[in-house]
From Swiss-Prot:
It comes from Alteromonas mediterranea (strain DSM 17117 / CIP 110805 / LMG 28347 / Deep ecotype). One of its GO terms (cellular component) is plasma membrane. Pfam families: NhaB. This is Na(+)/H(+) antiporter NhaB. GO terms for molecular function: sodium:proton antiporter activity. It comes from the Bacteria. InterPro entries: Na+/H+_antiporter_NhaB (IPR004671). It is a multi-pass membrane protein. The chain crosses the membrane at residues 25-45, 97-117, 135-155, 234-254, 302-322, 352-372, 388-408, 445-465, 474-494.
């Protein structure tokens, strides 16, 4: 039977995505212009919900295509403009450069990462201690590096472990070429247990980036914006956040202990003994067969790792440029000089970079259609500690839906305007800045669209291998979401004002004048 041209086009549309999914996207594209004609505000929220739906279905179809189609249509019907989308991309250029260069840079350091993490996983037999070491390490690193960089490291390590086991279990040698996406030659029981084990470590690490990232001004992009507007330096930012961030960090680690001990929310998965043996054999094989040149590579990569941490922690250059320097140093000192060998490093990050640009287009729609304005004005109508709590909650809820960088920057801009208009005092402003920072960083672990690092993990090459779907990520993050949100909320409501006063009395921080924030804000 001959296929008609329309049927052929439909078959090609979104490839092997399920039929119901294709029809759903087509339905979205048909109804959106009509909703926009009736009520642009409702149309804006409809588009945001549809975009979140494409993220939730990331394992069925990469979100770039359906999300991109929805955005292109939104541009044509006037929900936003290419110029505004371009502006949002320009504002977030550092994040895009970070993705392109830093993730590729990490790729060229994977020999060192595998060397270190294989030793860690083999030596630490206790899963609880291993989980705590992963969450603590990712929190510590995220306080100085960018969360995306830390997640890129963890993904690289996870992929390394997975491919080693997959090769050996499929009857291949460590150095054989092998397709680790095909499970045909494997025993399924150990593989499922190993997937569960790696999923646990991935999620603990991802949450760790949020715990550490909230503490310092370099931890997350929106922290820099908030510190900049408020005129705080690195130390002052850390001290002002401490009354909320330190209790949250402690309770975050306690949550890890409870989850690993009880085995709830699919945590507590152990490393199967057969897989451990393969990793031990791999470690021995690599140690025995390591040549002088390979040892030299590891030493150079360790030195580059030190440069990476020092460069990022001291802000010697923008994150993307430091990533570019890592690529240049790592490849030139490892002898990787062919274009095709360089190209492999960019495969992981570029699809996500394109997706993030689409995401910034959706942010442009949110701004142009004023989707968050009613919430912002409502929150500003409160006073005192209630206002701080409402800021924290409103930031948290909106950060679960939208990008937390956008939410944080919108709120701090609104609060700075309120300060300049004389609606709030400078001391109130400083405490609201703490509530905004913690509100955007902590509850946003609830969904992958809240944190760029979580979204990167969801759309990375490792997610389908570990069966890490949007729903599963939300479910595994749920206990952390509840604990971090509640502890952060209680610390903001009960402890923040008193603790800040104690810090003033101890002269660890000083009172600012309203003029400082105004001058800072005008400059940016």
């Amino acid at each position: 039977m001959q296929t008609s041209m329309i049927a052929a086009i439909y078959k090609n549309f979104l490839g092997h995505a399920p039929d119901w999914y294709k029809k759903t996207i087509i339905a979205f594209l048909i109804v959106n212009p009509f909703i926009f004609m009736v009520d642009p505000y409702i149309a804006g929220w409809t588009l945001v919900i549809q975009f979140i739906f494409t993220l939730a279905m990331a394992l069925k179809c990469y979100p770039l295509q359906p999300g991109g189609l929805l955005l292109i249509e939104a541009m044509f019907i006037g929900m936003t403009s290419p110029g505004h989308m371009m502006h949002e991309i320009e504002v977030n250029l550092e994040v895009l450069l970070l993705l392109v260069f830093m993730v590729a840079g990490i790729y060229f350091m994977k020999d060192l990462l595998m060397f270190l993490f294989t030793k860690l996983v083999i030596k630490v037999r206790n899963k609880l201690i291993l989980s705590l070491s992963f969450i603590f390490a990712s929190a510590f690193l995220s306080a100085f590096l960018d969360a995306l960089t830390v997640v890129a490291v963890i993904i690289s390590v996870g992929l390394g472990f997975y491919s080693i086991y997959h090769k050996v279990a499929s009857g291949k040698e460590f150095h054989s070429d092998h397709d680790h996406t095909s499970d045909d030659e494997l025993g399924s029981h150990d593989l499922e247990d190993f997937r569960a084990f790696l999923r646990n470590l991935m999620m603990h690490s991802a949450v760790g980036t949020a715990l550490g990232g909230v503490m310092t001004m370099v931890g997350e992009p929106q922290n820099l914006i908030i510190a900049d507007k408020a005129g705080w330096d690195f130390v002052e930012f850390f001290i002002r956040m401490a009354p909320v961030t330190l209790p949250v960090f402690v309770f975050g680690l306690l949550t890890t202990v409870v989850l690993e001990k009880t085995g709830t929310f699919s945590y507590g998965a152990k490393l199967p003994s057969a897989v451990r043996q393969i990793l031990v054999d791999y470690n021995d094989h690599m140690d025995k067969g390591r040549s002088k040149r390979e040892t030299a590579k590891l030493v150079v990569q360790a030195l580059i790792g030190i440069w990476l941490i020092v460069g990022l922690a001291t802000h010697m250059a923008s994150v993307g440029l430091i990533g570019l320097s890592v690529i240049v140093l790592a490849t030139s000192m490892s002898g990787v000089i062919e274009e095709h060998a360089l190209g492999k490093a960019f495969e992981e990050a570029l699809p996500f970079t394109a997706l993030l640009c689409v995401f910034f287009g959706v942010v442009a729609v949110i701004i142009d259609q004023g989707l968050f304005q009613p919430v912002i004005h409502w929150v500003l109508s409160f006073e005192g500690e209630t206002q701080m709590v409402m800021f924290y909650l409103a930031n948290g809820v909106l950060s679960m839906v939208s990008d937390n960088v956008f939410v944080g920057s919108v709120y701090i801009t609104e609060v700075t305007a309120a300060l300049e208009a004389g609606q709030i005092t400078r001391d109130q402003y400083d405490m609201l800045a703490v509530a905004i920072n913690t509100g955007t960083n902590l509850p946003s672990v609830a969904t992958p669209n809240g944190q760029a690092a979580f979204l990167f993990l969801l759309t990375s090459a490792i997610a389908p291998l570990l069966r890490l779907s949007y729903g599963r990520m939300v479910m595994m993050a749920l206990p952390y979401t509840i604990v971090l949100t509640i502890v952060g909320l209680v610390a903001t409501y009960i402890g923040l004002a008193d603790a800040t006063q104690v810090l003033y009395d101890m002269h660890l921080i000083e009172h600012h004048t309203a003029v400082e924030a105004g001058a800072q804000a005008v400059g940016h």
